[in-house]
Design a protein with these regions (language model features):
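Helix-breaking motifs and short loop linkers at transmembrane-helix boundaries and internal kinks
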Residues: 55, 87, 108-114, 125, ...
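Cytoplasmic helix-loop-helix junction between adjacent transmembrane helices
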Residues: 118-158
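Conserved MFS/SLC helix-loop-helix module at the cytosolic interface between two early adjacent transmembrane helices
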Residues: 74-113
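Structural signature of the two symmetry-related core transmembrane helices
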Residues: 90-104, 310-327
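A late C-terminal transmembrane helix in Major Facilitator Superfamily
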Residues: 291, 361-398
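Extracytoplasmic gate region of multi-pass secondary transporters
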Residues: 43-44, 237-294, 349-353, 357, ...
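Helix-loop-helix hairpin linking two adjacent transmembrane segments in secondary transporters
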Residues: 153-206
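Residue-level signature of mid-helix packing/kink "hotspots" within the transmembrane helices
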Residues: 41, 69-77, 161-162, 284-288, ...
Length: 431
């Protein structure tokens, strides 16, 4: 039996050396996800400065974020199906070109309305990242490695949130806030060159050895080609709804911290912009730990004989149970304790998310993964639109941050019940 750690022959039977190309492909997914989140967080890091220049209220800030979320929600539906139809290589390239152009145009805005428009355009493009990345993982990794691979590329969200703020603050001091958008947008075009030069499916890639291809295709029988399905057809399956409803409930928690943590630290905890720039990396470093650790744990349990569904749900249960503890950050008497508990929240969410994303490739064949991921992303975007953009703008204005932070502590536990009921033991379905 093949273990979770790849075993290669000393030499490739075809005469070449054993390759490890799937890890290079994964590094490109990590790079794209990092760029995706850099383009996304620039606005929230710079909002104290932009807010003063454009006189943006908390409610207007919520509406601007809502424009991103609404577009992201709609885009997810169509991007998933688009990527399943056109293929990962071209689909991913189209998505990153779109969002990089939209990110660059933020530099030309002069009013809240302009910002809202370009945030919406950014959301449409960025909605393609996760359907494409999840599909790439399904194409390049056997099932036992997919949660770990997902956790690794998903760590790009945290790396962006960790290294981005101090770099953005430094660029702000040197060149002003408009240049920050141009610099981060340019990274997408650099990635595009590397991607188009490198990405092909494993069985036709000239640099993949036979040993690596055999490993990638070790569960090929289970992943046999089936007819492509659209999102309307996918909605007939309760497993699709289990994934989508879990995304609806838990994605807003991450979005809330992404959007509102900088103004929370500024308005409530009294941080200045430089202090925010150094506090956020701590929060998202711990999110990296959760993402990678959460991806590694179910694979470890599977190698010890656990069924994959049981291993996946045990890991998700652990992270869901940590979220109410993390929500106590709203009541923390000191800023240090508050940052520690927020770090627990981001870490636990990312550990949860790495496993939730992987349920799509656990349960659905490869030809449906991007479509189902797109449906889930749409529901996650809808939840984010309501619970991290529109509602917080009102609640923060009239009641403060505390009710929101405490309430979000229980969203993952509710989602866990839905996952248990609708995804069950996470066995592969036949379309």
């Amino acid at each position: 039996m093949m273990s979770g750690t790849p075993q290669f022959n000393p030499t490739d039977p075809t005469g070449g050396r054993p390759s490890h190309l799937r890890w290079y492909i994964l590094s490109l997914l990590f790079f794209a996800t990092t760029v995706n989140y850099l383009d996304r967080i620039v606005f929230s890091v710079l909002i104290p400065v932009i807010r003063e220049e454009m006189h943006i209220s908390n409610q207007e800030y919520g509406y601007i974020n809502g424009a991103f979320q609404a577009a992201y929600t709609v885009g997810f539906l169509f991007m998933g199906r688009f990527i399943d139809r056109i293929g990962t290589r071209i689909g991913y390239a189209v998505a990153i070109t779109w969002w990089s152009l939209a990110a660059a145009f933020h530099a030309l805005t002069g009013s809240p309305l302009n910002l809202g428009f370009w945030r919406g355009m950014l959301g449409l493009g960025e909605s393609g990242n996760f359907p494409a990345a999840i599909k790439s993982v399904a194409e390049w990794f056997p099932k036992r490695d997919r949660a770990f691979a997902t956790g690794l590329f998903n760590a790009g969200t945290n790396v962006a949130s960790m290294v981005g703020p101090p770099i953005i603050v430094a660029m702000l001091g040197l060149w002003g806030w408009r240049a920050c958008f141009l610099v981060t947008a340019s990274l997408g075009f650099l990635w595009l060159i590397l991607w188009l030069m490198s990405y092909q499916l494993p069985h036709v890639h000239p640099k993949v050895s036979k040993a690596e291809l055999d490993y990638i295709q070790s569960d090929l029988a289970e992943d046999s080609e089936e007819a492509k399905i659209g999102w309307l057809a996918a909605l007939r399956y309760k497993q699709t709804w289990g994934f989508a409803l879990a995304k609806f409930l838990t994605d807003p928690v991450w979005w809330f911290y992404l959007y509102w943590l900088p103004p929370y630290l500024y308005d409530v905890r009294g941080f200045n912009l430089k202090e925010i720039g150094w506090a956020l990396p701590v929060v998202y470093l711990m999110a990296d730990v959760g993402s990678i650790g959460g991806g590694w744990l179910p694979g470890y349990l599977m190698r010890r004989g656990w069924p994959h569904g049981k291993a996946r749900k045990a890991t998700m249960t652990m992270f869901a149970c940590l979220m109410p503890i993390a929500a106590m950050s709203a009541l923390a008497p000191s800023s240090v304790l508050a940052i520690a508990l927020v770090s627990l929240a981001t870490s636990s969410h990312q550990g949860w998310s790495a496993n939730l994303f992987t349920t799509t490739s656990d349960v659905f064949p490869k030809n449906a993964v991007a479509s189902v991921t797109g449906i889930g992303g749409t529901m996650g975007g809808l939840g984010g639109f309501l619970f991290s953009a529109i509602i917080p703008g009102f609640v923060v204005t009239y009641f403060g941050y505390t009710p929101l932070i405490l309430g979000f502590g229980f969203f993952h536990l509710t989602a866990l019940l839905i996952v248990h009921r609708l995804l069950g033991d996470m066995k592969r379905i036949t379309l």
